[in-house]
Amino acid sequence: LRNIVKTKIYYKFLRGNKNMWIVFSILSAFFAGITSILAKIGIKNTNSNVATALRTIVVLFFSWIMVCIVGSQGTIPTIDFKTWIFLILSGLATGASWLCYFKALQMGDINKVVPIDKSSTILTILLAFLLLHEEITMGKFIGVALIGLGTFLMIQKSQNKANKDDKNKLWIMYAIFSAIFASLTAIFGKIGIDGVESNLGTAIRTSVVLLMAWALVLFTKQQHTIKEISRKELLFIGLSGIATGVSWLCYYKALQDGLTSVVVSIDKLSILVTILFSIVVFKEKLSLKSFIGLTLMVIGTFCMLLF
């Protein structure tokens, strides 16, 4: 009985506290930030494509929970043919981005891969300007410049380490392709996905990602490696999917109750969480140059959001 009373009091607190959306925003950024950390642990010895396919099952579960929460599943029959095409294209781009991202994570340092992936914002803005004729404000221009410079500084390595890693720079290619496909996801959404509730669109795209990921696993005949995955890595692969799902739930709750501009700004700070945990968990070092780059990326992000 005491536990029931405590639960009711806590629930009333969540509903009654007008500033709880800030807490949910912070939680959203936290869980988004640790997703890469959990995934990195989970793909140490596991094929990254297999890991992506497995974690997408968990992510898909959460994405449809979101749809049920907002009640948009009933609008599926109203989606027209053109929108379906762009939803599928967006899903394929998302899938390609995820596959490249986790491959890059497996091969490279988190504090190098994540900034490149986050720089997809730059390409998205440029493509929107060229293809959709969207205006680039001074705030966006400054933000793009700062994020670009910050990314460049963060991926720089000392000369000794650069010489050592000359033979293994494939992670850069995968990280760049991850950013490119992430940008295409946004562009496809802008071009052809009109009138579809955002959570439903995410669920449909994630369904496409799941099919794509498993098709790749079957095509490359990697399905037999699933039974070879250690319990530890399987656990962390699942936890990375759960972290993504919980981040989405917190983000939605924060958007529902709070100021959109502030919620988005806090969520963008997930890169700070990722970098911090990469230092603590993987002992990755953040040089002065990388620290300056990270600072520029954060400032650039706020420039685009606030101006």
Task: Describe the function of each predicted region.
Residues 42, 51, 104, 130-132, ...:
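Hydrophobic/aromatic residues within transmembrane alpha-helices
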Residues 33, 37, 64, 91-95, ...:
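Hydrophobic/small/kink-forming positions within alpha-helical transmembrane segments
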Residues 27, 54-55, 89, 116-119, ...:
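Hydrophobic core positions of alpha-helical segments in small-molecule transporters
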Residues 63-74, 124-136, 181-194, 243-257, ...:
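Hydrophobic alpha-helical transmembrane segments in multi-pass integral membrane proteins
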Residues 9-30, 39-87, 98-108, 156-174, ...:
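Membrane-interface interhelical linkers
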Residues 57-62, 116-130, 208-212, 266-280, ...:
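Alpha-helical transmembrane segments of compact multi-pass small-molecule transporters, enriched
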Residues 2-26, 122-180, 287-307:
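Juxtamembrane helix-loop boundary signature in multi-pass membrane transporters
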Residues 49-50, 111, 137, 199-200, ...:
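Residues that define the loop-to-transmembrane-helix transition and helix capping
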